[in-house]
């Protein structure tokens, strides 16, 4: 975390406030609405102000001219909730979407969300099929890294695709998707994977 974000300073407990879905934060003259958007994590919120949404991880990772990808991470990955959260963001009809990884999406927010939505399904189903086939976790990590890297390069106009892949791996390491998917399929849909793989350790 320090490599990515620098030193994280402690926040006094009396300055921490838990927000509920739909709660409005008054920062005069601004009113910012917190919207619960689980899927990446159960506590995740996006923040809506005027025609802008500060999307957090649920809105995907997108670097430069690369595509939006979903940061699948353990332990709280939940695919159905992720789709519901994307639908919530889409319904806001925002003109600007701000991503923590990284930057501002403007004028193509709907396209960004559609591409992210499609990739959530495609990646989760690819991982499910490999888990169902009893692929060992170490091999699955390697296979998924190759799959993701090929996906990043497909149709990309980036000339330095290796550099782009390195940047994506730094921001969102592909091995975390394997850990997140294993737990998700084992916990929520054990009937869709093999019996041998369907028990959480």
Q: Where are these predicted regions, by residue range?
A:
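Active-site-proximal loop/helix segment associated with metal-binding centers of metalloenzymes
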Residues: 2-10, 58-71, 122-124
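Active-site/pore-lining binding-face segments in mid-to-C-terminal subdomains
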Residues: 80, 85-146
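Soluble or luminal CAZymes and related metallo-dependent hydrolases
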Residues: 74-81, 119, 173-177
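C-terminal regulatory/interaction regions
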Residues: 129-201
């Amino acid at each position: 975390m320090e490599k990515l974000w620098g030193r994280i300073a402690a926040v006094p407990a009396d300055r921490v406030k838990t927000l509920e879905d739909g709660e409005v934060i008054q920062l005069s003259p601004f009113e910012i609405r917190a919207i619960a958007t689980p899927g990446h994590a159960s506590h995740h919120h996006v923040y809506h102000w005027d025609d802008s949404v500060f999307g957090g991880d649920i809105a995907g990772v997108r670097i430069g001219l690369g595509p939006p990808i979903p940061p699948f991470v353990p332990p709280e990955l939940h695919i159905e909730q992720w789709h519901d959260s994307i639908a919530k963001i889409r319904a806001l009809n925002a003109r600007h979407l701000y991503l923590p990884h990284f930057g501002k999406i403007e004028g193509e927010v709907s396209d960004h969300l559609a591409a992210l939505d499609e990739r959530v399904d495609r990646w989760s189903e690819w991982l499910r099929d490999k888990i169902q086939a009893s692929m060992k976790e170490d091999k699955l990590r390697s296979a998924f890294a190759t799959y993701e890297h090929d996906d990043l390069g497909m149709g990309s106009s980036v000339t330095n695709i290796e550099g782009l892949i390195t940047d994506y791996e730094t921001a969102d390491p592909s091995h975390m998707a394997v850990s997140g998917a294993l737990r998700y399929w084992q916990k929520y849909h054990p009937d869709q994977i093999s019996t041998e793989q369907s028990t959480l350790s």
